[in-house]
């Protein structure tokens, strides 16, 4: 009986330690995201400028502009993404951008 209690207590401690590590990782990721949003707030790229395809469309200036990348751009070294005009749903998607005050009237 005591063995079962000790084993279950060790199991609880192990699970608790893993959840603490996950929480620390989540806090680090949140801090990195906050830094990225601070960058996005500071600058918005003009239409036609080279943008980072791995980031959100918020980096492009204007409600309907998005970061458009060529087909299979990740596998080509010379391929660059550019801020190009998108569809109306791009403006709907960009309503949640932190830097929307720069282009909204």
Swiss-Prot record:
Primary residence: secreted
Keyword Signal: yes
Tissue: Expressed by the venom gland.
SS bonds (residue pairs): 51-67, 58-97, 60-83, 69-81
Coiled-coil region: none
Proregion residues excised on maturation: 18-41
Gene Ontology cellular component annotations, sorted alphabetically: extracellular region
Molecular function, one GO term: potassium channel regulator activity
Entry-linked InterPro entries: Toxin_34
Signal sequence, start to end: 1-17
Keywords from the named record: Disulfide bond, Ion channel impairing toxin, Neurotoxin, Potassium channel impairing toxin, Secreted, Signal, Toxin, Voltage-gated potassium channel impairing toxin
Compartment(s) where it occurs, according to its Swiss-Prot or TrEMBL record: Secreted
Entry keyword annotation includes Nucleotide-binding: no
Family: Belongs to the neurotoxin 04 (omega-agtx) family. 01 (type I omega-agtx) subfamily.
Function of the molecule: Insecticidal to house crickets. It induces an excitatory slow-onset impact that leads to irreversible spastic paralysis. It also modifies human voltage-gated potassium channel Kv1.5/KCNA5. Most likely, it binds to the voltage-sensing domain of the channel, suggesting it does not block the pore but prevents its opening at physiological membrane potentials. The recombinant peptide binds to the channel in an irreversible manner and slows down the hKv1.5 current activation kinetics. It is not toxic to mice, when intracranially injected (at 0.5 ug/g mouse).
Protein name: U2-lycotoxin-Ls1b
């Amino acid at each position: 009986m005591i063995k079962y209690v000790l084993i279950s207590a060790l199991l609880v401690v192990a699970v608790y330690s893993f959840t603490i590590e996950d929480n620390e990782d989540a806090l680090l990721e949140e801090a990195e995201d906050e830094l990225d949003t601070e960058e996005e707030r500071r600058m918005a790229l003009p239409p036609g400028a080279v943008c980072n395809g791995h980031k959100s469309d918020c980096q492009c200036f204007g409600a309907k502009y998005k970061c458009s990348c060529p087909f299979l751009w990740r596998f080509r070294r010379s391929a660059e993404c550019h801020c190009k005009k998108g569809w109306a749903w791009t403006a709907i998607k960009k309503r949640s951008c932190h830097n929307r005050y720069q282009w909204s009237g």
